[in-house]
A protein has these predicted regions:
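Active-site and adjacent substrate-binding regions of carbohydrate-active enzymes
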Residues: 1-437
Length: 437
């Protein structure tokens, strides 16, 4: 394997909204990130991954982008972003951003034009299909629950959304869409961005027959993942993306890839793979339930250890994986992976040490370095995460009480990772530990 500039780097993910607020509006911002660059440098961080800071209605906390070329005013300005790039460069640090191109916001100009003329040019930027006898085109369930198809008022058409209805899927079969997305990616790389974490990218290739599938839940729907899992051709899209963007800039790319087929690892992260690396989620799927969070099993520590070991052996001959304990989509690792008796300073340090010492590129999530644990939630109204709210109702519909449904959500909610980082601890050096651990 040829050595790349990122092979010996340590990455740190920032969820800007809850990192550090410097203007008193209760929302973390770019100024807060800039002010903590020295702290992150002293912590040993080389690469900073920013969760979405693009203009957005924030239905899905920024993963619904309404303008790919603008910074959300909640976080600051383009001038501040450019300052962040410059200040990071002074410290020999690199900035990467989330790249969300499976879908956009329903407030994006493209989608608004498509709604205005569902038979026009922009309709082909998305997936519009006619319903069947007053019902959606197929029985797919979105990742956030409910049908993947949303009706277009005043027509017999529906549009596809694998996530929230406010996140219409982009039509990657349309070469015009691909070209416009590539132009946007290159625009950011020209600014000095070092690369991207690519969100939900495996979903871009669909089974265009949109045929009904056997239901896999009491709602009569089938998981939308089944629409993409057996379709060939995603690699063609990914190679085209790489050729026209990342490859030209020697950019660092991290793919969010789930459920790869046997033998595909080298295609994704080999010498000529689609991405520089992908996240290792092998341990995270241990706590997946059959029907939702409410029937998710607790993680057996020996199974966790075996999952990590197997993953390390599997990747030895073809590349490097990105090792994570937690991120913005996962609960806190201490609460998830450690048994109650090990949720103490020794257990917390062990968990972090294992992640850092594994072969690969370590990714630390904000607050992980001080051992942050899951938060306490007293009602479903306290949650911001759209997926958590859906999981709560899924549990209630399955017969669980309010208390039982909340308990299930409290273990696995994405909001556990999105609570504010205690500012009083962000002055700590890598060798120091806060008193409460």
């Amino acid at each position: 394997m040829k050595k790349k500039w990122w092979h010996d780097k340590v990455a740190y993910q920032i969820y800007p909204k809850s990192f550090l607020d410097t203007n008193g509006d209760g929302i973390g911002d770019l100024g807060g990130i800039i002010s903590k660059l020295d702290y992150l440098k002293e912590l040993g961080i080389d690469i900073i991954w920013l969760s979405p800071i693009y203009k957005s209605p924030f239905v899905d906390q920024g993963y619904d982008i309404s303008d790919y070329y603008a910074i959300a005013e909640e976080f600051g300005t383009m001038e501040q972003f450019e300052e962040l790039l410059a200040e990071a460069k002074k410290r020999d640090m690199y900035i990467i951003m989330d790249l969300v191109i499976n879908h956009c916001s329903d407030q994006h100009e493209w989608f608004q034009k498509a709604l205005a003329d569902p038979e026009g040019e922009y309709a082909d930027y998305f997936y519009f299909r006619k319903g069947k006898n007053g019902n959606p085109p197929s029985n797919y369930r979105s990742y956030f629950g409910g049908s993947c198809w949303e009706p277009v008022p005043g027509t017999d058409l529906y549009y596809l959304h694998m996530f929230a209805k406010e996140q219409p899927d982009l039509n990657w079969e349309n070469p015009v869409v691909r070209k416009k997305l590539y132009e946007m990616v290159n625009w950011w790389l020209e600014k000095g961005l070092a690369g991207f974490r690519i969100d939900a990218i495996i979903n871009i290739k669909k089974d265009l027959t949109f045929s009904d599938l056997d239901p896999d839940g009491p709602d009569g729907l089938a998981n939308c993942w089944r629409m993409v899992e057996n379709v060939d051709g995603v690699g063609i899209f990914l190679e085209d993306l790489k050729k026209h963007t990342f490859q030209k800039y020697d950019a660092f790319t991290v793919g969010e890839v789930f459920n790869m087929k046997e033998g595909e690892l080298a295609d994704f992260i080999g010498e000529n793979g689609h991405f520089s690396t992908i996240f290792d989620f092998s341990a995270h799927i241990l706590s997946e339930g059959e029907h939702g969070w409410y029937d998710a099993p607790p993680v057996d520590f020996k199974e966790w250890r075996k999952a990590i070991s197997d993953s390390q052996l599997r990747v030895q001959t073809c590349g490097l994986e990105a090792n994570i304990i937690e991120n913005h989509d996962e609960p806190r690792g201490v609460s998830r992976f450690l048994p109650d008796y090990a949720q103490n300073p020794a257990g917390t340090k062990m968990l972090g040490t294992v992640s850092i010492l594994l072969r690969g590129i370590p990714f630390i999530y904000q607050g992980q370095e001080i051992g942050m644990q899951n938060a306490v939630w007293n009602s479903v109204e306290e949650y911001n995460d759209i997926n958590t709210i859906d999981q709560y109702h899924t549990a209630r519909n399955a017969g669980l009480t309010d208390k039982e449904a909340l308990k299930a959500c409290s273990k696995l909610s994405r909001d556990n990772a999105r609570t504010p980082v205690p500012v009083s601890y962000t002055h700590l050096r890598a060798h120091e530990t806060p008193e409460h651990l």
